[in-house]
């Protein structure tokens, strides 16, 4: 990850203050401009908004989607929680096992098959927006959604990096360990070791194209907008 000039430093990247509105607009400009720069307006764009549950990943994904629609881009927002595995698989080692939460809860194979596969070269653009409803532990039976060519898929949720998903842009909403603990409900703090492991094994603040620090929700900071022309992840 490149380092941008800024006024805050977290030990890895230098950050500068930004508003959510400016951040969203600059991300939308970048995504919309990727197709123009590549000369392939028919290719789908795939965006990650990665972060722990206390981070506003869903809110940013929806705001980014709206900004892209205003630029004439069809958008499909996908919540990773719609691809949680069945309870029998998630809770095989108990309901509060942080390693199982990290390794087993999210069905990455289904995400490859139902979300990324249809948006690959030669795909038909028919994306399954969700697979299961975790609140009732049943399949959602949602119909496939046709995302027109030139459209953008925005996937949001935790642990999105490190799987070689073919994102054209990855945004990580980071929280310091203290902020993450403070903003996590007491009954969910058993998950904290999973996020410590993610930080250690994947280093999302370095792996992502854009890093946003969201310790103070009203006062985010980031490492600056992505540069046009940078190669997509492998």
What is the role of each PLM region?
Residues 41-47, 150:
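Pre-Walker A (Motif I) flank of P-loop NTPase domains
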Residues 47, 76-78, 154, 169-171, ...:
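Hydrophobic/aromatic beta-strand patches that form the interior of the parallel beta-sheet core
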Residues 1-34, 169, 173, 178, ...:
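NTP-dependent small-molecule kinase module
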Residues 66-76:
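Post-Walker A helix-loop "phosphate-sensing" segment adjacent to the P-loop in P-loop NTPases
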Residues 11-12, 76-137:
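Conserved nucleotide-sensing/catalytic segment adjacent to the nucleotide-binding pocket
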């Amino acid at each position: 990850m490149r380092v941008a000039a800024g006024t805050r430093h977290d030990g890895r990247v230098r950050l500068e203050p930004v508003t959510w509105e400016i951040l969203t607009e600059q991300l939308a400009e970048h995504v919309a401009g990727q197709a123009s720069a590549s000369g392939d307006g028919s290719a789908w764009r795939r965006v990650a908004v990665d972060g722990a549950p206390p981070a506003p990943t869903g809110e940013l994904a929806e705001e980014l989607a709206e900004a892209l629609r205003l630029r004439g881009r069809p958008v499909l927002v996908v919540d990773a929680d719609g691809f949680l595995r069945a309870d029998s698989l998630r809770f095989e080692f108990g309901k509060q096992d942080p390693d199982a939460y990290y390794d087993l809860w999210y069905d990455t194979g289904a995400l490859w098959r139902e979300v990324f596969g249809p948006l690959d070269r030669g795909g038909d653009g028919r994306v399954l927006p969700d697979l299961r409803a975790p609140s009732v532990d049943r399949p959602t039976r949602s119909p496939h959604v046709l995302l027109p060519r030139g459209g953008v898929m925005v996937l949001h949720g935790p642990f999105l990096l490190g799987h070689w998903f073919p994102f054209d842009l990855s945004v990580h909403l980071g929280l310091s360990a203290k902020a993450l603990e403070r903003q996590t409900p007491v009954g969910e703090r058993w998950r904290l070791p999973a996020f410590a492991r993610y930080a250690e094994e994947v280093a999302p603040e370095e792996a992502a194209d854009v890093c946003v620090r969201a310790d103070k929700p009203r006062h985010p900071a980031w490492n600056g907008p992505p540069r046009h022309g940078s190669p997509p992840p492998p």
